[in-house]
């Protein structure tokens, strides 16, 4: 039986976070009434000329620097010629032979797949290019009595099309890359990453070939995948479709396909065009884009600390593991919250802060379906909770209750933890005399567990600890309870 290798390359369209469009002053705001944000340039009215948006160029430069790419000192805009109702000019302004960003790479972390028996691993994906272009408008096929409505609000919206080499070998790798890229463009502040609004969407080029064969198989391109789940499902379906087709004696046709999320399958959209079909030529209305070293240096000086650099700093500065550092820098907001938390709680509590952020805080965020920047418990409020754990005022169990209380009541005061501790009498019992008296009562009431422990059953000790904690309503210092029990049991 033939063993097949999957070959995947991704083309990602990231909408750049400029206020105005790439070649006009019209707004890029999402959700406006149809055709209310389309100026004469976007409508391709006679006599208008495009003017390049400097902010879009600077965002492209920022991306190129972040991935270690070459920022072209001179790049050229080209006309990509095709007819479609939502493309008023009859061509799209893009870049072809000389893109603004050339090369670069992104390192991805592919998670373990226990069902397939695969461990987690890292991989570097090389990028071919990233180029600037304008978006087209939108065709609306519903509510028009069999006709099509055209909304040109998106026409001219600035995009950075980011193209990888065909180096990914599974849907899992493609999703890991897409997530890494998604996180990076948001970290850099060049794209809001809103997939529901179309700000970040992927086209997947998928082919299969026998293992060991160097020549690529015929590829199909799956267009406009706007969620990570759709990306994974579409690739997996397409791989199965192509393998079954070849093994049944058929041939894969080079074509563009769409993914149907309801049926969880891809379907043919049109035959795939090659570059020559678009008749690219330099746009005579736009001068070549010249980017000097001083411009690049200025943009570099304004860039935030990159995730990889911050990860290494977290490991060295706070003593967290490489895995923890990766989670803590998964988004810029998460990293900023962690640093604010440690600044308030103290560097000595950095590991405790990391554990809480990845554990209880993330759990509550997932429960409520919100991101860290919408967390109702501020870094200062959580820091006080951690300080009270560290100084022995409360146990970790009580701390969790206090955290949930602050979360649910959306308390505004930084000293919420101390207020709740006093109001509910939650201070940990650390008085040795008081604890000894309680433990004596527990031992007297649980003679059977005492006998079992002395007979060598360790589980009996845990049962006694549990009874002691129950007797103190969770307020006892667990470490002291353990020590006193061991002392009394000999």
From Swiss-Prot:
This is Aspartyl/glutamyl-tRNA(Asn/Gln) amidotransferase subunit B. It comes from Burkholderia mallei (strain ATCC 23344). It is an enzyme of class 6 (ligase). Allows the formation of correctly charged Asn-tRNA(Asn) or Gln-tRNA(Gln) through the transamidation of misacylated Asp-tRNA(Asn) or Glu-tRNA(Gln) in organisms which lack either or both of asparaginyl-tRNA or glutaminyl-tRNA synthetases. The reaction takes place in the presence of glutamine and ATP through an activated phospho-Asp-tRNA(Asn) or phospho-Glu-tRNA(Gln). Belongs to the GatB/GatE family. GatB subfamily. SMART domains: GatB_Yqey. Its EC number is 6.3.5.-. Keywords: ATP-binding, Ligase, Nucleotide-binding, Protein biosynthesis. Pfam families: GatB_N, GatB_Yqey. One of its GO terms (biological process) is translation. InterPro entries: Asn/Gln-tRNA_amidoTrfase_suB/E, Asn/Gln-tRNA_Trfase_suB/E_cat, Asn/Gln_amidotransferase, Asn/Gln_tRNA_amidoTrase-B-like, GatB, GatB_C_1, GatB_Yqey_C_2, Gln-tRNA_amidoTrfase_suB_CS. It catalyses: L-glutamyl-tRNA(Gln) + L-glutamine + ATP + H2O = L-glutaminyl-tRNA(Gln) + L-glutamate + ADP + phosphate + H(+); L-aspartyl-tRNA(Asn) + L-glutamine + ATP + H2O = L-asparaginyl-tRNA(Asn) + L-glutamate + ADP + phosphate + 2 H(+). One of its GO terms (molecular function) is ATP binding. It comes from the Bacteria. The keyword ATP-binding applies. Disulfide bonds: none annotated. Heterotrimer of A, B and C subunits. PANTHER family: GLUTAMYL-TRNA GLN AMIDOTRANSFERASE SUBUNIT B MITOCHONDRIAL AND PROKARYOTIC PET112-RELATED, GLUTAMYL-TRNA(GLN) AMIDOTRANSFERASE SUBUNIT B, MITOCHONDRIAL.
């Amino acid at each position: 039986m033939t063993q097949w290798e999957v070959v995947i390359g991704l083309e990602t369209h990231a909408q750049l976070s400029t206020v105005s469009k790439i070649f006009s002053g019209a707004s890029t705001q999402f959700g406006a009434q149809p055709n209310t944000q389309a100026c004469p340039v976007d409508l391709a009215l006679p006599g208008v000329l495009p003017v390049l948006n400097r902010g879009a160029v600077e965002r492209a430069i920022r991306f190129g620097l972040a991935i270690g790419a070459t920022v072209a000192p001179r790049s050229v805009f080209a006309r990509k010629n095709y007819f479609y109702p939502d493309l008023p000019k009859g061509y799209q302004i893009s870049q072809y032979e000389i893109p603004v960003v050339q090369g670069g790479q992104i390192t991805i972390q592919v998670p373990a797949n226990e069902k397939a028996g695969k461990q987690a691993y890292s991989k570097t994906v090389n990028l071919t290019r990233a180029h600037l272009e304008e978006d087209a408008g939108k065709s609306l096929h519903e509510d028009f009595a069999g006709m099509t409505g055209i909304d040109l609000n998106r026409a001219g919206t600035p995009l950075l099309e980011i193209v990888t080499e065909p180096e990914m070998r599974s849907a899992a790798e493609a999703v890991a890359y897409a997530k890494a890229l998604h996180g990076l463009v948001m970290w850099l502040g060049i794209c809001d990453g809103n997939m529901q609004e179309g700000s970040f969407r992927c086209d997947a080029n998928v082919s299969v070939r026998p293992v060991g064969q160097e020549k690529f198989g015929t590829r199909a391109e799956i267009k406009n995948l706007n969620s990570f789940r759709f990306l994974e499902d579409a690739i997996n379906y397409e791989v199965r479709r192509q393998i079954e087709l070849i093994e049944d004696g058929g041939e894969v046709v080079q074509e563009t396909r769409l993914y149907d999320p309801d049926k969880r399958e891809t379907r043919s959209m049109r035959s795939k065009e090659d570059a020559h079909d678009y008749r690219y030529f330099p746009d005579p209305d736009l001068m070549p884009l010249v980017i000097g070293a001083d411009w690049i240096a200025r943009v570099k000086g304004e860039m935030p600390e990159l995730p990889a650099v911050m990860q290494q700093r977290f490991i060295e500065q706070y003593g967290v593991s490489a895995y923890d550092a990766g989670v803590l820098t998964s988004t810029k907001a998460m990293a900023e919250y962690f640093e604010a938390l440690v600044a308030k709680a103290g560097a000595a509590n950095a590991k405790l802060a990391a554990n809480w952020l990845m554990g209880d805080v993330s759990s509550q965020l997932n429960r409520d379906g919100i991101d860290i920047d919408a967390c109702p418990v501020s870094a200062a409020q959580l820091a006080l909770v951690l300080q009270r754990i560290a100084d022995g005022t409360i146990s970790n169990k009580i701390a969790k209750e206090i955290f949930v209380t602050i979360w649910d009541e959306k308390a505004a005061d930084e000293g919420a933890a101390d207020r709740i501790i006093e109001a509910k009498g939650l201070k940990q019992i650390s008085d040795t005399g008081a604890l000894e008296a309680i433990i004596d009562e527990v031992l007297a009431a649980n003679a059977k567990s005492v006998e079992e422990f002395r007979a060598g059953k360790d589980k009996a000790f845990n049962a006694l600890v549990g009874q002691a904690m129950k007797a103190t309503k969770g307020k006892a210092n667990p470490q002291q309870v353990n020590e006193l029990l061991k002392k009394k049991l000999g």
